[in-house]
Amino acid sequence: MIFTVTEVTKMVNGVRTVVLWDRDIQEGQLVEEELAFWAQDDSGNVWLLGEYPEEHEGKKVSAPAAWLTGIQQATAGILMRAEPKMNTPQYEQGKAPRAEFHDLANVFAENQQTCVDIGCFDGVLVVDEWDPDQQPQDGHQFKYHAPGVGIIQVTALGGDEQETLVATEHRTLTPDELAAANARALELDGFGYTRAKAVYAGSPPAELVPRPAR
């Protein structure tokens, strides 16, 4: 999996979101590409307002699991609380009935030390995620969030098709790489108007909003 934060934004249900571009590459082949639409509120909570995943099967490309907040009863959810703590109520990360997406989460552990390929990290937060609409045996995912980096590891408990991931690289893109990522995110968003018409029809196109130079 390759996760890229782009300079592309998209208005979703009246909220300007940042567009993330994810790629799932297996044995050198692109299996899935996804746009995820994130936003942060004034309190510091990070929200998920929609996803546009494209599934690649040979030359066939489809997007059956696309969803946007406010369309087809889909609702936004919190990806990360501003001040995540243990022993607090579980929270919803989003719900989209037509896309069969529904995730709940809770803080499982705080201030952990976790070592992966890119190094060892202190202060790691472990978040337990699960789909309440699935059977208990379908399992849980545990995502390890390192301060200033993001997710560095994903482990699983139960389930036959759970993903496990370990971070192998974390870096800033070159200007050319960032430009290419922006272009691909805009292209994928454009595909949404033909491959996920029912979801995308009423949404404005994504647009490039370059970050201020540092």
What are these regions (language model features)?
Residues 1-42, 49, 55, 84-214:
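Acidic, serine/threonine-rich low-complexity disordered tracts
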Residues 30, 47-48, 65-70:
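Generic detector of bulky aromatic hydrophobic side chains
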Residues 46-48, 58-61:
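Beta-strand-rich cores of mature extracytoplasmic or soluble domains
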Residues 60-98:
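Glycine-rich (often Gly-Gly/Gly-Pro-rich) flexible segments and glycine-rich loop motifs
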